[in-house]
């Protein structure tokens, strides 16, 4: 039996990269670092110290930009350890560049969309979008041509015209050069999320990126700067923020039913044994598939956003509070190593991702966040989603329920049979009474149609509908680039913590000083009269588009005969 140590790149890839570009750049970086360390000992001025630090960060980003594409996926962001705490560098906002907080753009009455990545999730997204008025699918792209072509049948079923097809390793680059696309919807493997998004943003397109949208700090800061400088939306497609229970719980928290929410839990605990073989493999020699391969090479919570996203909105992160300090711990790999061996016949002596990873985060306002990641051990599906407030408690897994103080609900106009606080969940009857007054406006607006269209019980459809709604009405998106940064940073920051003996890591302020500019998380809505006019125009466009599509497919069938 062969034993192999798992590394970020295969041996031949590393050798080629080192020989051609990485080694010279690394030596250059090391040279400047040695100068920095020598000079810093004699510096007394804090301002001068900071300038040198910013120079080092800029140099690191320049080096990263010149590296081969596959090195973008590495954990390599510069950091220091000060008084036992790991502090990553925060690059200065370039001169003339403005924050993207509350970013709005001109209304887009008809959202022209291109889909990139049509394997597991992409086709379902195409199908959902055919139910949304005021959209036009302009392009379909996948590494495998047949996958992209297959999605034409979805458009045909919806009586929408065929879209242009792109395929191959660089198909997305040609797609992004088009000028008739408003939004690029990205559902590729993880390593291509950033690459496609970067290309799209550079060509002036808004992007919606599947989770996790960025795999490391380099990609995170790059997306922030692109969104800010280009004034383009960067939305992470975190569907769990749109699940019915989470939306209703968020609404209750915003209305004060939980008092002050002080402790929250979230997770992605989902044993993936039925799915490992479904992940795309790049040729016959790829025995692992992209997701298991990634887990073998990277430590940390590499899939944090399903658990973190919904609870982050409850805590108003970068809207009055911010993540401050992170500590992570993990088990070693047990089942992960066995999966590797079963698929390759080789024993991986250094399978990076532990079977179970736990991350604790404290916030500026004294709250605590607990996040779990486990895709390796047998257990029921569990995103945890637990909110502990000074006046109430919410829990979703494994038991779904609310435990709220009777006096709080009485003030809110909800009469219940008894005080459940600290003892048991509300009865089914009292929960129904509660939801009559505290069902989220989002659920009221989209819930019934979402159940019909589907997509993880309807939450995917609500997510897509809200994205289109905000673009059509010129509103800020529900999830911005700073949400993306905060929710995705757990991977590299957690790895830093664990690789340094579980030291605390200072979570950077991705807004660069503006985290308290807005007070409280809110969904944006247009004025009723504006909303009605926008929807009427969208419905009319779709009616005409479907008439055009019906003629197109009738002719296509006739030509085929």
Give names to the regions the model predicted.
Residues 183, 189-190, 194-242, 256:
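Beta-strand-loop-alpha-helix segment that lines the small-molecule cofactor/substrate pocket
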Residues 47-58:
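Bacterial N-terminal signal peptides that target proteins for export
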Residues 57-67:
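Bacterial N-terminal signal peptides
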Residues 75-158:
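N-terminal Rossmann-like dinucleotide-binding module
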Residues 18, 22, 35-41, 45:
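Short, positively charged and aromatic/hydrophobic N-terminal segments
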Residues 230-233, 240-351:
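Predominantly a Rossmann-like dinucleotide-binding segment in NAD(P)-dependent oxidoreductases
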Residues 71-73:
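Boundary at the C-terminal end of the N-terminal hydrophobic targeting segment
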Residues 75-87, 91-95, 124, 312, ...:
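C-terminal helical cap and adjacent loop that interface with cofactors, partners, or active-site loops
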């Amino acid at each position: 039996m062969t034993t192999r140590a798992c590394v970020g790149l295969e041996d031949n890839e590393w050798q080629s990269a080192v020989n051609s570009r990485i080694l010279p750049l690394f030596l250059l970086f090391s040279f400047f670092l040695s100068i920095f360390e020598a000079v810093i000992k004699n510096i007394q001025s804090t301002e001068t110290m900071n300038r040198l630090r910013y120079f080092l960060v800029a140099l690191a980003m320049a080096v990263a930009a010149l590296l081969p594409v596959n090195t973008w996926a590495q954990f390599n962001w510069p950091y220091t350890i000060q008084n036992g705490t790991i502090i990553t560098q925060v690059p200065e906002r370039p001169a003339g560049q403005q924050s993207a907080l509350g970013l709005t753009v001109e209304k887009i009455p008809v959202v022209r969309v291109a889909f990139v990545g049509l394997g597991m999730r992409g086709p379902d997204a195409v199908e959902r979008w055919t139910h949304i008025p005021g959209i036009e699918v302009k392009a379909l792209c996948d590494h495998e041509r047949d996958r992209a072509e297959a999605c034409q049948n979805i458009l045909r079923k919806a009586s929408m015209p065929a879209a242009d097809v792109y395929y191959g390793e660089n198909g997305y680059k040609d797609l992004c050069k088009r000028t008739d696309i408003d939004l690029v919807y990205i559902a590729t493997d993880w390593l291509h999320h950033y690459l496609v998004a970067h290309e799209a943003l550079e060509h002036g397109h808004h992007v919606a990126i599947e989770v996790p949208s960025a795999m490391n700090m380099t990609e995170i800061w790059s997306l922030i700067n692109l969104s800010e400088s280009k004034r383009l939306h960067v939305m992470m497609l975190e569907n769990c923020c749109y699940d019915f229970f989470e939306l209703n719980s968020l609404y209750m928290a915003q209305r004060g039913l939980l008092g002050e929410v002080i402790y929250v839990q979230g997770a992605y605990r989902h044993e993936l044994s039925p799915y490992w073989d479904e992940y795309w493999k790049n040729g016959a020699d790829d025995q692992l598939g992209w997701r298991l391969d990634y887990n073998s090479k990277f430590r940390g919570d590499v899939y944090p956003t399903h658990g973190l996203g919904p609870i982050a909105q409850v805590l108003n992160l970068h809207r009055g509070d911010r993540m401050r300090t992170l500590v992570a711990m993990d088990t070693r790999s047990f089942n992960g190593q066995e999966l590797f061996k079963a698929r390759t016949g080789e024993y991986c002596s250094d399978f990076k991702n532990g079977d179970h990873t736990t991350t604790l985060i404290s916030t500026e306002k004294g709250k605590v966040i607990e996040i779990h990641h486990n895709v390796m051990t047998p257990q029921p599906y569990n995103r945890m989603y637990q909110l502990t407030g000074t006046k109430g408690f919410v829990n979703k897994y494994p038991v779904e329920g609310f435990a709220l103080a009777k006096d709080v609900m009485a003030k809110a106009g909800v009469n219940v049979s008894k005080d459940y606080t600290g003892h048991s969940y509300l009865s089914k009857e009292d929960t129904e009474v509660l939801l009559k007054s505290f069902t989220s406006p989002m659920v009221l607006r989209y819930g019934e149609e979402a159940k019909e269209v589907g997509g993880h019980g309807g939450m995917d459809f609500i997510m897509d509908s809200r994205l289109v709604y905000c673009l059509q009405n010129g509103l800020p998106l529900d999830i911005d680039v700073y949400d993306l940064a905060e929710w995705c940073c757990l991977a590299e920051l957690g790895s830093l913590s664990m690789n340094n003996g579980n030291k605390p890591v200072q979570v950077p302020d991705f807004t660069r000083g503006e985290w308290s500019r807005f007070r409280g998380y809110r969904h944006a809505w247009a004025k009723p009269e504006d909303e009605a006019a926008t929807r009427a125009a969208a419905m009319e466009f779709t009616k005409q588009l479907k008439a055009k599509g019906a003629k197109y497919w009738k002719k296509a069938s006739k030509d085929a005969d």
